[in-house]
């Protein structure tokens, strides 16, 4: 994989910048932490070289100074709001986050329930945490929020919230998802800190959009693609331009709320430490791009992936996705279209050469493309996977890594005993068959050694793959796109 981002430089520069921001205030900084902390795969795709856990590793460099406060809205607890990526509710995700933070040595100080309401589900959640030794605090709905600044910044506003007791200079405010109230918690804490004579500060940590890249840079367009369902819009920061005469990039929600936040700062502290939304941020990612062309290409590919996913989701649901039109606009702005990538062209060519049967193509790190076709033993994705491993291992494409004799009993098991209509082996099944062939087949052993080199490779399928195949390819770290059509497109029900 071509590298466009210096991860080591990022870890050092980002942690140093946060330390500088802590020092600007009374050795107390509330850091609103947006985005994914443990598994930022979007960042790793658009900034090749950025590790999915880079933000976590950066925090670990500050772990002696840092404590974590997790924020969850009472409304989300009562509504059983789900995290789509993990398939768990927000309240369960709080427990997962606590385990994850503590597991790497970060101190979790407490959990704050925002928009508190006296509901049985909320009480049970608090009691469970307290029983586990985790302190809980309550923040309440404030009438007139966020525009009635005078009321909010008063004893009848923030003053009614619990003061979250913290021990360390850096307080990281994070949450299971958006809309949990992270910024409100930070500002409420500032109010209480100033009441106690502590001149604490606030900063915002978000990787995207990258403030010191151009507005229409593919990395920033890819962020808009990733948040198309939220309708976030990147825009130039007018406050930063007015204050410093410099053009920077932020997104609409931060720009729109800045006058309100600024007024709150002035009421809390007497004056605001910031002159623009960009000033509030601490993101150093833009300074760690070492190959702009690599990041541009990766980001353009990501926009295409997002569009294909939207089309496939639309096909599966039968409902037009509003974000589709936003994604089409972004593709137009980026100057890209479907069918332009070589991996797509080769997959379609293989399908045409096999009378329209499903086909797949994989682009390896060096740009080489291998294809796979539908056969009696393997699906197209499974075939492409084996062919990619052969290519990586320097094995002739005609060599069998797994014999038909080994595959046929698995097919019998699937169709005769497990109720499957499709006898062909899925990607997970062929990998298991490959691993079981290692002791008897030296080529299978060589191919197995190449599996890590599939990470970061694009794979394109001419039909929507099953969730089994999609999950396996995701576990391998491959980037899947599918045409929005099913193998048996005339059927009304399609197994996921």
Regions found by a protein language model. Give the residues of each.
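The conserved Walker
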Residues: 177-178
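A short, polar/charged loop-to-alpha-helix boundary motif
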Residues: 377-393
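Short clusters of small/polar residues that mark proteolytic maturation junctions
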Residues: 373-374
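Short HxH-centered metal-ligating active-site micro-motif
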Residues: 391-423
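Flexible phosphate-sensing "switch/lid" loops adjacent to ATP/NTP-binding sites
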Residues: 1-174, 189-350, 354-357, 364-366, ...
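Hydrophobic positions on the alpha1 helix immediately C-terminal to the Walker A/P-loop
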Residues: 185
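Transmembrane alpha-helical segments and their cytosolic interface motifs
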Residues: 182, 359-361
